[in-house]
Amino acid sequence: QQILETAEKLGYIPDPMARNFSLRRHLSIGFLLPQMVQFSLQNPYTLQVIFGIGNVCEKYGYTLTLIPPLHKSITEAVRSAAVDGLITMGMQVEMEIVSVMQTRLLPYVTIDGTPDAQMPSVNIDDEQACFEIMRLVLEAGHRDIVLVSLSEDAFASPAKDQSVPNKRMRGYRRAMAEVGLELQKSQVLVSECTMEDGIRIGKEILARKIRPTCVVAMSDIVAIGCILACKQAGLGIPDDMSVVGFDNIDESSCIMPQLTTVDQPAKEKGRLAAEALFRMINKETLESVHMEIPYRIIRRESLKSR
């Protein structure tokens, strides 16, 4: 008590950083950006995930640190991150980054990653979602289809590969197989997850001798880029070509025509991942290690029946 009274008389203000150091806490959690900053923050899906995480951080009095790759290496960024825990996107258990986090004794949760006993995760059923939206495209009469993947490896990926692009590709192929179609490599293009690259992909599709009747993209922002490329070329959507996306970002219902898509609740993914991480930081038991949340197929004007 005497020490406290003396400190008050002297106008001493406790240093919160020193207190945090004594508790071995930084009062910050990190979110590993899936791409470099300029790409990640252009992606509305990623921004909604960040929004969901940020709301939970505010509730617990923590800051949120966005961690981009350091010298193009996300592993190096994790080695030096001053955080109490990490949320990642698309992480698989065999990645080097997992061993780095385990060595640092950092709790972590992955969004859109591979479910594993060692790695808490928040996902939707990506394969089934893509099966259902491709079935919708096929039921609309489309057979000349181009898929826009987010991974070079998705077309030839083994069945055991549980990355999101590969699970989505399996869903598309399964729906096509039901009607006797086999996906050809020439039908698959690869895009960065940006609108600019979506425009590039759209122009590449339009330059083909035989134009597809429908483009199915693994990302709304890429699908919207394709629509813009078509409009710039004077084509009508969906009269000249249908376009389908994935994510249900806000822009998908603002563009004309509105985009047919898969609604996955990005903000809720971020919220659930952050809540799970705080339970781990506080040494509490998780109610569920792997959380799978619902999705919805939303048909809008960008898909036309033939």
Predicted segments — roles?
Residues D15, N43, M95, Q162-N166, ...:
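Serine-centered coil/turn micro-motif
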